[in-house]
Structure formats: structure tokens, C-alpha cells
């Protein structure tokens, strides 16, 4: 008997020690995730507040709205759930309903802002002239207001009126569920109607829009890259054919194969960039929303494949929230924001003063292309920088390209209809960072 009791005590102690180790690891991981989310999104907000040229770009309004929604996820949602995960129960009592409303509101706002950014990028690329006229600060604020209003309506009203909860099968079950939610946990089961409707509005419609817009963006970029490559080959071909030997006879000229390889690398780079944007978003949120629609149809004793326990479901909840820590890296790490971050953190003092060689290709409606190159020191921020990026930003202004064209070399080429300006660095790392409307006279609009 004594041996059995000792073994039982040792087994219990081992379980307790293992449980304590798991809690410590969980606390470290969740703390790191929360801190990274806070740091990344705070840097985005601080950069826009600190640097005026970032505030002057309409497209950055959407990035700021996204950063605010992700920052609210890190402040109003993640810490409370992290404490509950570590403690093993919900210690905040009746705050549960308010927390659930914040969770739905902030997560929905983050996803809808991602959707708005994709639509904004598509408009800027497909109709640059119309975009420049109609995408005013007022229009941007209207789009942002719609996203946030929809997020509030889908969260606070149903939660405060208890429309989101599944109806209990009996009065005793209802009392037990209510007591459990307010004391021990905050994992209220959603009703089937609310789970499906909220998932459709918060995720499935936005992800469908994002897939369509980014697919069309890739097709437009692919078409323009191939068009530019064809014009480059024609220019090189014409130049080579003009070369003559000592006898005055032209040298046989051939099509350069390097242009085909460079075009393929550019297309691959664009595809990788868009794949990262969509892949990260889908991998983070899709598992949660699939389970969110399936679990309301599972009974209390179901053992079906997708009827998982609450602990496994919580893992996918954290996967979705982790998207808020990745958004600043994906959507705010263009050249302007990187320079702003370096200045805010003082990193440019520690980094070597390397120059980034950039080639700008501007093509107007009459088919005239202007090629120019300049070197931009890393860590420097221009006082008046009005560039707006395609991924995740698009349309640029006239002042920067006018300066570039003043030092550039003009090369007349064949006919080309849409105006396009693409930034290509010398190692074929394509970011497609500018699309600049050009008038028929070859001048940028003022």
C-alpha cells in the first residue's frame, strides 16, 4: 500500500511539474507574440505621426487604420485571453461579454481593412487617372468608416443583446452555461445563425474580394512587365543592328536572352509577393473560420473529425490573432516606412552607408519611355516624398519622377497605351512600387 501511494504521489508530482512547465512556455510564447504585435503596429503609428510625408499619402490612411485595428487586438483582446490560458480559467468575471465584443470587432476591423487595401491597390493600378482624381482623403475616410462601422455593428449589438449565444436545450442547461461563462470560462458557444453570418461578413466575403483583386493585380503587372521587356529587347536589337564593321556592313544582331530571363524573374518576384500577402492571411484565419462554422453543429458528446475540444480551437484562435503581428511586416515595410523605422529606432547610425541603385521606367500614352537611374542612400528620408507604393501601395506623384527625368535619358519606343512607371533594381528584385499617370504630351499631371 505504501509503495502504491508513493507511486501515485510521484505520478501526481510529475503531472503538476509538467503542467507548470507547459504554462511557463505558453506564457513566454504568448508574451512574445503580444509584444511583437504591440511593437510593430506602434512603430507604424509613430512613423506616420512623426513624418509628415507619410501622412500626405491617401493610401497610407488605410495602412494606419489597419495598424490601429491590430494594435487594439494586442491591447483589448490578446492579453486577457493570455491570462486565461496561463491561469487555466477566466478570472475576469462578467467582463467576458465586453471582451467577446472587442474580440469580434477588432478582428473583423483588421480583416476588412486588409480587404479595403486590396481594393485600393487594384483601383490605383487598373485606373490610375481616375484613382488620382477620386481617391481623396474624404473618400478614404468613408471607406475606413464603413469598415469600422460594420465591425462595431457585427460585434457589440449581437453580443450585448445575447444574439450570439446558442440557445440552451433546457432551463437548467441555460443556468449552468451562464454561470460557467461568468465564473470559470469565457468560451460561450455561438448560435449557428450568428456563427455563419458573422463568418461570412468578417472573412469569407473579404477573402473572396482579396483573391479577385490580387489576381487581377498580378495579371496587370504581368502584362506590363512583358510589354516593357519586349520594348527593351526592341531597343537593344535596334542598337545592335546599327553597329557596323570596318567594311561598313552591319553586324548580325540577335535577340538578347537575358531580357527573357529578367522578365521571368520579375514576374516570379511579383507572384511571390502577392502569394505572401494572401498566403499569410489565409493560413492565419482560414482554419479558425472553418471551425467556427462547424462547431455550432457539434453536440456536447460528438466525436466527429471536426468537432474538436476547446483547447485545440483556442490554438487556431491564436493563429488568427498572430496575423496582427505579421501585418506591419507585410504592409508597412516599403522603402518609406523602412527609412522612418530606421530613423525612429536609430538603426541607420549602425548600418553601413550603402547605396541602393534604382532604375525608373516611365512610359507615356504615346509610347515614349524615359529611363533614369539614381542612387538612394539607405536610412535617408526625403523631406518631400510623395511616392505611394503598389504592394501594399500604388500611385506616385509628379515631383519625384520630374527630378528623376531631369537626370535621365529619353528613349522613344513603339506604341504603348497605359501609362506605367515601375521601379526595378539592378538585381531584378521587382517591387512594382510606382504607377505614375502620364499625359499624352509626356508630362506628369500637376
Curated annotation (Swiss-Prot):
It is found in: Cell membrane; Endoplasmic reticulum membrane; Cell projection, Cilium membrane; Cell projection, Dendrite. SMART domains: 7TM_GPCR_Srsx (SM01381). The chain crosses the membrane at residues 24-49, 61-87, 97-119, 139-163, 193-218, 273-299, 313-337. It is a multi-pass membrane protein. GO terms for cellular component: ciliary membrane; cilium; dendritic spine; endoplasmic reticulum membrane; G protein-coupled receptor complex; GABA-ergic synapse; glutamatergic synapse; non-motile cilium. InterPro entries: Dopamine_D1_rcpt, Dopamine_rcpt, GPCR_Rhodpsn, GPCR_Rhodpsn_7TM. Keywords: Cell membrane, Cell projection, Disulfide bond, Endoplasmic reticulum, G-protein coupled receptor, Glycoprotein, Lipoprotein, Membrane, Palmitate, Receptor, Synapse, Transducer, Transmembrane, Transmembrane helix. Glycans are attached at residue 5. Residues 50-60, 120-138, 219-272, 338-446 are cytoplasmic. Residues 1-23, 88-96, 164-192, 300-312 are extracellular. Disulfide bonds join 96-186. It comes from the Eukaryota. CDD domains: 7tmA_D1A_dopamine_R. A lipid is attached at residues 347, 351 (S-palmitoyl cysteine). Detected in caudate, nucleus accumbens and in the olfactory tubercle. GO terms for molecular function: arrestin family protein binding; dopamine binding; dopamine neurotransmitter receptor activity; dopamine neurotransmitter receptor activity, coupled via Gs; G protein-coupled receptor activity; G-protein alpha-subunit binding; heterotrimeric G-protein binding. PROSITE patterns: G_PROTEIN_RECEP_F1_1, G_PROTEIN_RECEP_F1_2. GO terms for biological process: adenylate cyclase-activating adrenergic receptor signaling pathway; adenylate cyclase-activating dopamine receptor signaling pathway; adenylate cyclase-activating G protein-coupled receptor signaling pathway; adult walking behavior; astrocyte development; behavioral fear response; behavioral response to cocaine; cellular response to catecholamine stimulus. Interacts with DNAJC14 via its C-terminus. Interacts with DRD2. Interacts with DORIP1. PANTHER family: ADRENERGIC RECEPTOR-RELATED G-PROTEIN COUPLED RECEPTOR (PTHR24248), D(1A) DOPAMINE RECEPTOR (PTHR24248:SF139). Belongs to the G-protein coupled receptor 1 family. Dopamine receptor whose activity is mediated by G proteins which activate adenylyl cyclase. This is D(1A) dopamine receptor. It comes from Homo sapiens (Human).
Amino acid at each position: 500500500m505504501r509503495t502504491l501511494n508513493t507511486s501515485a504521489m510521484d505520478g501526481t508530482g510529475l503531472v503538476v511539474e509538467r503542467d507548470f512547465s507547459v504554462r511557463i512556455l505558453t506564457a513566454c510564447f504568448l508574451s512574445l507574440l503580444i509584444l511583437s504585435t504591440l511593437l510593430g503596429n506602434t512603430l507604424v503609428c509613430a512613423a506616420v505621426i512623426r513624418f509628415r510625408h507619410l501622412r500626405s499619402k491617401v493610401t497610407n490612411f488605410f495602412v494606419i487604420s489597419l495598424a490601429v485595428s491590430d494594435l487594439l487586438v494586442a491591447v483589448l483582446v490578446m492579453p486577457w485571453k493570455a491570462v486565461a490560458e496561463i491561469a487555466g480559467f477566466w478570472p475576469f468575471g462578467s467582463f467576458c461579454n465586453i471582451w467577446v465584443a472587442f474580440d469580434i470587432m477588432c478582428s473583423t476591423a483588421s480583416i476588412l481593412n486588409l480587404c479595403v487595401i486590396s481594393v485600393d491597390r487594384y483601383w490605383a493600378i487598373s485606373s490610375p487617372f481616375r484613382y488620382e482624381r477620386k481617391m481623396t482623403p474624404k473618400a478614404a475616410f468613408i471607406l475606413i468608416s464603413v469598415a469600422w462601422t460594420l465591425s462595431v455593428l457585427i460585434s457589440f449589438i449581437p453580443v450585448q443583446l445575447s444574439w450570439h449565444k446558442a440557445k440552451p436545450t433546457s432551463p437548467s442547461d441555460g443556468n449552468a452555461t451562464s454561470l460557467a461563462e461568468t465564473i470559470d470560462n469565457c468560451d460561450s458557444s455561438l448560435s449557428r445563425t450568428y456563427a455563419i453570418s458573422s463568418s461570412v461578413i468578417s472573412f469569407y466575403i473579404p477573402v473572396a474580394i482579396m483573391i479577385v483583386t490580387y489576381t487581377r493585380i498580378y495579371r496587370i503587372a504581368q502584362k506590363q512587365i512583358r510589354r516593357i521587356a519586349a520594348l527593351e529587347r526592341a531597343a537593344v536589337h535596334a542598337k545592335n543592328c546599327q553597329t557596323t564593321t570596318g567594311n561598313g556592313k552591319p553586324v548580325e544582331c540577335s535577340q538578347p536572352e537575358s531580357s527573357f530571363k529578367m522578365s521571368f524573374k520579375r514576374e516570379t518576384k511579383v507572384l511571390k509577393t502577392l502569394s505572401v500577402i494572401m498566403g499569410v492571411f489565409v493560413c492565419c484565419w482560414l482554419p479558425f473560420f472553418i471551425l467556427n462554422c462547424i462547431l455550432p453543429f457539434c453536440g456536447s458528446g460528438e466525436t466527429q473529425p471536426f468537432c474538436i475540444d476547446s483547447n485545440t480551437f483556442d490554438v487556431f484562435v491564436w493563429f488568427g490573432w498572430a496575423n496582427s503581428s505579421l501585418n506591419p511586416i507585410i504592409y508597412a515595410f516599403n522603402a518609406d516606412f523602412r527609412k522612418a523605422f530606421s530613423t525612429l529606432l536609430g538603426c541607420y547610425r549602425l548600418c553601413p552607408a550603402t547605396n541602393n541603385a534604382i532604375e525608373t521606367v516611365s512610359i507615356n500614352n504615346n509610347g515614349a519611355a524615359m529611363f533614369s537611374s539614381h542612387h538612394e542612400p539607405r536610412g535617408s528620408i526625403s523631406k518631400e516624398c510623395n511616392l505611394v507604393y503598389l504592394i501594399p501601395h500604388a500611385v506616385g506623384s509628379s515631383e519625384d519622377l520630374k527630378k528623376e527625368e531631369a537626370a535621365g535619358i529619353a528613349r522613344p519606343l513603339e506604341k504603348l497605351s497605359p501609362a506605367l512607371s515601375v521601379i526595378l533594381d539592378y538585381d531584378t528584385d521587382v517591387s512594382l512600387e510606382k504607377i505614375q499617370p502620364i499625359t499624352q504630351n509626356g508630362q506628369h499631371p500637376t
